[in-house]
């Protein structure tokens, strides 16, 4: 009897071990990624993921043209098909500013403020099986996970892996950097051809994992159908390690590229020049003034001071600048500041 019981228990234990191995093989990288989430400062968290980032599967489906569809795909990927939810994303407008400069020794730096009515930022450091290593940021409130949601506790941390599919800004190991900013009006872009569909924020993740420089990024943008997030117009600030800096805008569903080191929340292209520029908003002018004063040459401290000077304070109904990034494109790395806490830098490097 004891021998039979021992055999049964060993058999059950063997099945449990096999089941555990199968679960780990399927979910291991995701579980490890979720457990990596740590709080850096008020309103800012960091997590790291290594493995299949889900983008090959997304593109194989032809992409998605809405944030809700993309969010549902993200949750399905995280559950490995065992859960298929209906997700409703939030639609709030946001501000922002960006500036790219050179250093005295020929390097390239890019600064960026993300301004939003409310936000909790999660830094996603992704080392994908296929593609470039990236460090990106997203606002978890974008997905509408619920009031007072924070990336704390395993369940919430796991949900934050949706950030694999969306980014508001970021840099890759090749020194390509991109930031998404509101463009100044509510005219949406919805390109509908036979190309794969991506939303504004999904395209950032896709480009950073597949493009080494601005030229390659523009080719990738031309290879997809762009769809506006949050029911509004967007434009990209995009720079690379060579020093090329462009603004990508969309007019009548056509991509327009403008060479510019600075950007805020109004159009720069000739077709809609200054649309969205409001009285009293001098952030863009102040950035351009600093470029002229310095001839576009600054060190990291000077760029940080410059981008901090156009950050936005909190006011009623508006959080202000949720996070600031200062990126080194020549030696790919990024320093974050949360909620204008410019005395509390958080530095991360790529190419590990």
Label for each model-derived stretch:
Residues 5-205, 209, 298-352:
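N-terminal mature-domain region immediately after signal-peptide cleavage
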Residues 208-211, 216-219:
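Short N-terminal edge-element motif at the start of the domain
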Residues 263-306:
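Charge-rich, low-complexity intrinsically disordered segments
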């Amino acid at each position: 009897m004891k021998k039979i019981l021992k055999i049964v228990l060993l058999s059950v234990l063997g099945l449990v071990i096999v089941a555990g191995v199968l679960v780990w093989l399927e979910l291991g990288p995701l579980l490890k990624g979720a457990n990596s989430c740590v709080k850096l400062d008020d309103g800012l968290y960091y997590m790291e993921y290594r493995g299949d980032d889900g983008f090959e599967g997304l593109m194989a489906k032809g992409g998605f043209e809405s944030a809700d569809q993309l969010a549902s795909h993200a949750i399905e990927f995280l559950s490995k098909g065992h859960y298929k939810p209906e997700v409703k994303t939030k639609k709030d407008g946001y501000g922002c500013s960006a500036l790219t400069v050179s250093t005295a020794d020929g390097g390239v730096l890019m600064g960026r403020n993300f301004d939003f009515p409310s936000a909790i930022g999660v830094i996603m450091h992704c080392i994908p099986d296929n593609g470039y290593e990236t460090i990106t940021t997203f606002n978890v409130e974008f997905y509408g996970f619920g009031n007072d949601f924070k990336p704390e506790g395993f369940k919430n941390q796991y949900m934050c892996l949706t950030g694999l599919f969306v980014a508001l800004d970021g840099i890759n190991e090749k020194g390509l950097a991109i930031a998404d900013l509101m463009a100044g009006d509510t005219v949406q872009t919805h390109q509908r051809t036979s190309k794969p569909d991506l939303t504004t924020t999904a395209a950032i993740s896709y480009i950073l994992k597949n493009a080494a420089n601005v030229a390659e990024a523009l080719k990738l943008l031309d290879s997809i159908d762009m769809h506006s997030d949050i029911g509004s117009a967007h434009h990209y600030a995009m720079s690379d390690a060579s020093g090329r800096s462009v603004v990508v805008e969309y007019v009548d569903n056509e991509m327009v590229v403008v060479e510019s080191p600075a950007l805020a929340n109004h159009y720069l292209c000739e077709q809609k020049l200054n649309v969205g520029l409001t009285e009293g908003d001098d952030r863009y002018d102040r950035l351009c003034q600093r470029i002229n004063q310095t001839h576009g040459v600054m060190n990291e401290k000077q760029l940080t001071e410059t981008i901090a000077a156009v950050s936005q304070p909190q006011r009623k109904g508006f959080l202000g600048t949720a996070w600031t990034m200062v990126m080194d494109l020549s030696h790919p790395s990024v320093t974050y500041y949360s909620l204008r806490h410019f005395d509390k830098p958080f530095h991360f490097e790529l190419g590990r």
